[in-house]
């Protein structure tokens, strides 16, 4: 939620696991001076999913130092866990790519929320942003949501943050709009870093 509050230097750390392939990575996402996302990945043992060992913490510090020129002095803690099923489609020519995520599950401690089984997140990537999949989605009146982040949506859906109005369009489409305001205990999670089981999709239809 740092970008929701206008903070220029932002860092998110997540542990990502691919269940079928039995692969695991520690990912560090940062914002450079141009506002572009920089993502660095470290191979990680599957049995260490959900934890950060010394090598993982050193990776975080190294990435932070290389971009910002300062040591990473923050304490990391697990805040939210996310799981979902993904289908990836890749065109044989042209480099067009589509991912379809479904059965999303968000969890913080004892609390959890899921999306309906017939609701999906579709992300498209093409050279000019006007690929075949984009044209089909537009014809079906399915237009991109301006702001979307699984982490932010999950935190809002579980009422772990005070402000989430910028993500209301995504929350409504996924039908996980929080029903009440968060308590101070829930709000204590703000500013921490997420651990999840897969990619965060930057574009949402």
Could you describe each region identified by the protein language model?
Residues 1-205:
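Phosphate-end processing signature that detects enzymes handling 5′-triphosphorylated RNA
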């Amino acid at each position: 939620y740092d970008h929701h509050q206008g903070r220029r230097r932002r860092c998110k750390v997540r542990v990502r696991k691919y269940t079928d392939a039995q692969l695991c990575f520690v990912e560090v996402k940062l914002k450079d001076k141009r506002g572009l996302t920089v993502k660095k990945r470290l191979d990680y043992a599957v049995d260490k999913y959900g934890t950060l060992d010394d090598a993982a913490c050193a990776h975080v510090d190294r990435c932070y130092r290389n971009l910002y020129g300062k040591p990473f002095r923050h304490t990391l803690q697990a805040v939210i866990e996310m799981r979902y099923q993904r289908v990836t489609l890749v065109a044989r020519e042209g480099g067009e790519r589509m991912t379809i995520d479904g059965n999303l599950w968000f969890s913080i401690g004892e609390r959890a929320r899921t999306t309906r089984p017939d609701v999906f997140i579709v992300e498209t990537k093409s050279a000019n942003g006007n690929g075949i999949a984009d044209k089909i989605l537009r014809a079906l009146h399915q237009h991109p949501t301006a702001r979307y982040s699984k982490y932010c949506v999950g935190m809002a859906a579980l009422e772990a943050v005070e402000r989430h109005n910028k993500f209301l369009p995504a929350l409504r489409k996924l039908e996980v709009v929080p029903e009440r305001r968060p308590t101070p205990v829930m709000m204590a999670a703000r500013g921490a870093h997420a651990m999840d089981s897969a990619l965060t999709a930057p574009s949402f239809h």
